[in-house]
Amino acid sequence: MKKNLFLLVIAFLMCGKVWSGGLLTNTNQNVSFLRNPARGASTEIDAAYTNPAGLAFLTHEGFVFSINNQSAFQTRSLTTTFAPFAGFGDNATKYFEGKATAWVIPSIQAAYKTGDWVFSGNFSVVGGGGTLEFASGLPSFEAQISMIPLSVNQQVGANAFTGYSLESRLKGSSITFGGQLGVTYSILDNFSAYLGVRLNYVNNSYEGYLKNIQLRSANGGVYIPVQNVVPTVGDMNLDLKQTGLGIAPIIGLDYKWNNLNVGITCELKTAIELTNETKENTTGQPQFDDAFKTPYDIPALLSIGAQYDILPALTVSAGYHHFFD
């Protein structure tokens, strides 16, 4: 047993040596999280995700299931001030609004307990999960176009154009599905360990355009298609999907002493490489080309939780999450 414990300790220390890319991890994988977000020492069925080693202390043997759905809606606003923006709408300050919608964010936890063993699984949306749409595009998109009248005026040495107009839109979605399987074993009556893996499948999509770009002439305010003035500038369209797979090893420990329970879970880094499936890319940006590959690692996560039963109907809990990002 000492050898097994030593190997577990070494594996936990490895968490500190794992580094990765952007942070995109959902930890609210059961509706119990909405009641109490400190689930790192749970011994209920949601522990299949939050504290899998704690499943050793399920109150009865046999199968246990939990099927959940959550919905999320969010508005993201950007207010940007940039002098050339005044060429379209006569205001240098512009407001861009994006609406995020996710009607279905499912998760399923299941466990089968027999003696000292518990076999468990979790399927959930471990990253992303919604669609975000900016109906008027983004400020970074429009900023490029807003500079064209000034640039043309400088080249011709006259105030030939006083503004611009365009149509812009961006819609994107990012979903990471995770399927987790693992085994929990009661090493002692009050001490258990878990070993498992999660297969992560990433599916991102992006659709957007900049089109109908026109320049406003100083002569009567007539709008002229930009290509008549700057042939190298035209409509830009983007339609692509990115997919990738990665596997994350997961280990966990749980210790129970009287009314106190402590759980520790470590998810190692998930190395993922996304591959583009591009239907259209006229942006001139090579990172959107078909078959282009992008690193998309999910960072390692160390979760520590504790809960104490003050009374049979009163429990206090606390948790700590550290992403090695």
Per-region residue spans from a language model:
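Positively charged n-region of N-terminal signal peptides that target proteins for export
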Residues: 1-4
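Residue-level detector of transmembrane insertion/anchoring sites
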Residues: 6-7, 41
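Bacterial N-terminal signal peptides
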Residues: 7-17
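A ubiquitous, low-specificity "background" feature that marks scattered single residues
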Residues: 8-10, 57, 195, 324
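N-terminal, post-signal peptide beta-strand-biased segments of exported outer-membrane/organellar beta-barrel
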Residues: 16-128
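Outer-membrane beta-barrel porins/channels
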Residues: 21-38, 42-43, 103-107, 111-325
